[in-house]
């Protein structure tokens, strides 16, 4: 059976390293499913939930919260370099919910003062918090 190696790397080190027979990622152009023997590719990634079907258990799905980055696919090695990434088992959902509340407050303040840069920062923080909550609840 053909498989690919999936690695998720952040500035803090390797966050994920397993064999898989399918992954799903999200780029600015939309969602992309990747199977073994995929063509070589480099693409940007958005804040999203990465879905991974591992080869060792066909009924198990791993979820990883990816907070932007790039994906490189070459010779059945899928490398994701991300600003930050967390597996579902490592996410503290209550902490993520507190981050969501903080981001919502910052967004309201930035919108009331018409600070475009702060609005964008708060929107990114909110997307990241919502992504972590979603993956943490899987």
Swiss-Prot record:
CDD domains with a match to the protein in the record: F1-ATPase_delta (cd12152)
GO cellular component: plasma membrane; proton-transporting ATP synthase complex
Entry keyword set: ATP synthesis, Cell membrane, CF(1), Hydrogen ion transport, Ion transport, Membrane, Transport
InterPro entries: ATP_F1_dsu/esu_C_sf, ATP_synth_F1_dsu/esu, ATP_synth_F1_dsu/esu_N, ATP_synth_F1_esu_C, ATPsynth_dsu/esu_N
Repeat as UniProt keyword: no
Membrane topology: Peripheral membrane protein
Pfam name, any one: ATP-synt_DE_N
Location(s), subcellular: Cell membrane
One Gene Ontology term of the molecular function aspect: proton-transporting ATP synthase activity, rotational mechanism
Membrane-spanning segments: none
Keyword Ion transport appears in the UniProt entry: yes
Coiled-coil annotated spans: none
Function: Produces ATP from ADP in the presence of a proton gradient across the membrane.
HAMAP family registered for this protein in UniProt: ATP_synth_epsil_bac
Family the UniProt entry places it in: Belongs to the ATPase epsilon chain family.
Summary of subunit composition and partner proteins: F-type ATPases have 2 components, CF(1) - the catalytic core - and CF(0) - the membrane proton channel. CF(1) has five subunits: alpha(3), beta(3), gamma(1), delta(1), epsilon(1). CF(0) has three main subunits: a, b and c.
Name used for this protein in its record: ATP synthase epsilon chain
